[in-house]
Structure formats: structure tokens, C-alpha cells
């Protein structure tokens, strides 16, 4: 079984990110780097981590007009991303533009395109928080609506919380990639995640990729923490 765990390395320090990645290579499936890291270190910082030979999840959550997102996506492909994110709420045209740009640029470079996955509702939002930003329907209904939009528009999958995995899997079928942040082992603190499950629970419900950050990166021994999660998953 392929290790589904991608470690969220949330830092501005390239040296720390590289050191963590080198330490965790044998215990995880890949590394996720986001805006915090990218704005501090740029493409060179991303390439320093991807150069270690592990799959890279470039989590920039692109959300703009279709032409702008398409142009940005070409740059993401050049970073060697295996997975990358856009916002589903950008709409069908934006999603299609992102997917087309990823495929076109990858073909030019002779590499596999990244899986373009669409963020639905941020896992830091509970129902009250979702209502504050204008979601009039329950979070689950909003996630399902955006998942259908993303799938119909060509996205490879979505990002949603573990609590929506089962419903989205039933709605979108077995081949739609479900990338799940908000994963917290039972022995770790919840932090700022409002909608979370343990790694084993999320996998049992149909999650494909488990994004785990501080339970690993903030542990006294990150490799030991990652190995503990790996064992819990039966890997």
C-alpha cells in the first residue's frame, strides 16, 4: 500500500523544511508546502524540497480569474508538483482553466501533470464560521455541492474535512481523489482544526491523502511520530 500521509511543513525557513523532509523521507508518502513557505522562499525553496525525490504537494489554493489561475498553474507544474490546490468556489471556468493549463504544461515538459484538487470548505471553519462567510446551507451540503462542481469541471479531486469524506465518496465515486487535512492522531492536540478524525478513521471512510502537520513536525521526535502514524495505518 502506498503511504497516504503527506506532511504539512508549515515554516518560512528553508533549512528547517529541508531538514524535516530529509528526516521523514522513509516514514511518509510526501511533503506539503504552502503559501507560508512559498512566499518566503519562492520556486527555489520548493525545488530544494522536491529535489529530495519525494512527491511534493504544492498547496497555494489558487483563486482568481481563469487566465490568471492558468498562468500561475503553469508555474506550479514547473515546480514538479504531484498534487496542487485551487479553490472550488472560483467556479467551473476557473477549474477547467487550471486543469487544462496543468495538462498542457506537463505535456510540454514531458512529465506527469499534478492532480489538481479543489478546496471546498476550510477545515478551520465550523458551522458557525461557515455561516459568517455567507454559507447559508449546512457545511456538508456546501462541500457536496462544490465537490460535484469540481468533478464536473475536470478536477482530479477535492480537499474536504474527514467528516465529509464518506458522503463525498458515495457522491463522486471511487476514482475521485479525496485529500484530507484536519487529521489528528488520538494522542495529539486538535489545534485549530474544528472538523477532524484520526488517520485510521479517515482512511476507513475513504480518504486517499492524509495531510498531517503539527502532530509530526512539532513532535519531540518527528520521525518517531510519523512512524507511529504509519504503524496505526498498518503500513
UniProtKB/Swiss-Prot annotation:
Subunit structure: Homodimer.
Record pathway: Pyrimidine metabolism; UMP biosynthesis via de novo pathway; UMP from orotate: step 2/2
GO CC entries: cytosol
Gene3D superfamilies: Aldolase class I (3.20.20.70)
Record family assignment: Belongs to the OMP decarboxylase family. Type 1 subfamily.
PROSITE patterns membership: OMPDECASE (PS00156)
MF terms in GO: orotidine-5'-phosphate decarboxylase activity
Superkingdom in the source lineage: Bacteria
Enzyme Commission identifier(s): 4.1.1.23
Function per UniProt: Catalyzes the decarboxylation of orotidine 5'-monophosphate (OMP) to uridine 5'-monophosphate (UMP).
GO BP terms in the entry: 'de novo' pyrimidine nucleobase biosynthetic process; 'de novo' UMP biosynthetic process
Organism of provenance: Paramagnetospirillum magneticum (strain ATCC 700264 / AMB-1)
Sites where the protein binds substrate: 10, 32, 59-68, 123, 184, 193, 213-214
Record's protein name: Orotidine 5'-phosphate decarboxylase
Keywords associated with the record: Decarboxylase, Lyase, Pyrimidine biosynthesis
Active site: 61 (proton donor)
Reactions accelerated catalytically: orotidine 5'-phosphate + H(+) = UMP + CO2
